[in-house]
Amino acid sequence: MLYVPGSSFPPVPFPDAPTNLVRTEDLAGLDRGSPVATMYVSSTGGAIRRLIGSAHRHVISVRRDPQMAFGQPTEGIAEGPAMMRCATDPDIGFYQMQPFRLVVPYAGTTGSYIADLAYVTRDGSVWIREVKRSLADLGKPQYVAKLEAVNRLLTRLGWNFRPWTLNEIKGSAERQVNTGIIYYDRAARIDDLMPRFELIAAKIERTTFGDLIREIDPRNTCRARAAVHRLIMMGRVWADLDGLLEDWSEVRLRAPSTAVRDLPFA
């Protein structure tokens, strides 16, 4: 069993861990039945690394997204855009920067790996991302060997583990424009507009971006536009963000996602 100890809680079984995690025939030096690896998460939830101090080699920040329960620490020039991509993508239902530390055996030794990003898509797929400016930043062969060991372990959990480069994160020029505009409205107040939206969503599944704005609040389309941006971030409205979001752009209205899984770092 893979164990997930919090800093102030006793170890607990990792949810849904397949039993073959305790079979260590392919991992020399471990006793049969011992955990293959150990995952550490914050005992209070959210990021495991707080980025406190002044000795960091990269640009650092802590960002807030009202859709998520915890702050989002970023390190390096690619993690900030990755956080914004997750925040604005209507197909991503949950994400957390710096979510866990994994201690895993590889190449005759044991290494510690802190995940840059975890997210869950609307279909329930769990993705763990190694965020880099480019694949050239993966560095030395020993680090690549550690990533390969992490990949083998996370694959056993049914998770997906992939590098994510800055160019992939930013996407097309149109997506970059949409991401910036939508992210600006991440804290738009929509509570009083939700009953109106639910009535609209119960009647129609597809409409245009402009028509939805006018339906939500015809008297204040500026506020309604911000509300639709927030609904995109919530996944309640889907739009193709690789094309400029114009009044005639098609959008789909969706029910709240039920696919987001309970994760030890959520």
What is the predicted function of each stretch?
Residues 1-266:
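Electrostatic, structured charged patches in enzyme active sites and in nucleic-acid/phosphate-binding
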